Amino acid sequence: MAHEILIAETEAFLKNVAPETRTTIISAITGGKSACKSAAKLIKNEHLPLMSGEATTMHIVMRCLYPEIKPWKKASDMLNKATSSLKKSEGRDIRKQMKAAGDFLGVESMMKMRAFRDDQIMEMVEEVYDHPNDYTPDIRIGTITAWLRCKNKKSERYRSNVSESGRTALKIHEVRKASTAMNEIAGITGLGEEALSLQRQTESLAILCNHTFGSNIMRPHLEKAIKGVEGRVGEMGRMAMKWLVVIIYFSITSQPASACNLKTCLKLFNNTDAVTVHCFNENQGYMLTLASLGLGIITMLYLLVKIIIELVNGFVLGRWERWCGDIKTTIMPEIDSMEKDIALSRERLDLGEDAPDETDNSPIPFSNDGIFEI
């Protein structure tokens, strides 16, 4: 079953490719090891009219189907760049979960339940591409199928076919994911109750969106509710950043002053018409000074540690060279690949509606219940 789903998602991914090229790739995927090897060699030698991203994606699919196909440096570099920001602990956790997933349904459920980011999904793809023999065929095919489904759903072509209610549902999903961050700041004084209230509201909105899917009447109300929740999420995030300094300040200024100072303060306050007087006792002054010095020292230590980490990354781990390479490829991409992609884009635009395409009318796999799927 997973193999059939992989073929369907591959056809959807290659929807804008020339029909002859698409037929060649699909025939190779369904034709066995030797056919897949031949097609992978054609892709690697750039003998098929595919853009850079399409070529690397198809090579990854074929190698995961048949590990005997040798890895392609271009695809490996793309995967390394996509996962460069991922922590090692996250990578270990993902590998453990992949081996326990079992098949396509297990892999997809893992992605949905954990709400994986793009770099986490790419870590899974990199694992089955670099070490295909460490995983069963079901896990390899399941990982690649889930990845292709994710790419298809994120494409502009896919989003343009989603209804207004579908877009609303996707926005609700983003708000619900953002609200889970409230768990991290729920323990901060003054924000716990607000965070729990916000989570309840977003969950209610998600349920309401599912119930009113396709309803034109409820859409404006849902849009307003989404904007309100998004604004509160952002405001609470900004409040959480300020609380560290605010708590230090209030922990000092809220201490009880001596009776003498309190009387003096009240007297000065009553005798002042246009000036507000705030009195600090001597101990509070010392504590504020120490707090300011402490924050300054912590900031300097943080910067020093960051500098040391960057030096270690540069000289010991050799990451500077890779970063420079990334910057170079971003500013000055490979001219040959860029020119080839531009030429292919123009060719496809020139063909327009004249190109025969038997799958133009076939819908991309998508269901109402699948709105919140990865």
UniProtKB/Swiss-Prot annotation:
Pfam family, one: CM2
Function of the molecule: Ion channel, which might have a role in genome packaging and uncoating processes.
Quaternary state and interactors: Homodimer; disulfide-linked. Homotetramer; disulfide-linked.
Glycosylation sites: 270
UniProt KW keywords: Disulfide bond, Glycoprotein, Host cell membrane, Host endoplasmic reticulum, Host membrane, Ion channel, Ion transport, Lipoprotein, Membrane, Palmitate, Phosphoprotein, Signal-anchor, Transmembrane, Transmembrane helix, Transport, Viral ion channel, Viral matrix protein, Virion
GO BP terms in the entry: monoatomic ion transmembrane transport
Family: Belongs to the influenza C protein M1 family.
Name listed for the protein in its UniProt record: Polyprotein p42
Chain ranges on the Extracellular side, renumbered to this chain: 260-288
Residue spans crossing the bilayer: 239-259, 289-309
Post-translational events: Palmitoylated. N-glycosylated.
Any single GO CC term annotated in Swiss-Prot or TrEMBL for this entry: host cell endoplasmic reticulum membrane
Entry GO MF terms: channel activity; structural constituent of virion
Cytoplasmic side: 1-238, 310-374
Site (Cleavage): 259-260
Modification sites for Phosphoserine: 337, 362
InterPro entries: CM1, CM2
Species for this entry: Influenza C virus (strain C/Taylor/1233/1947)
Lipidated residues (S-palmitoyl cysteine): 324
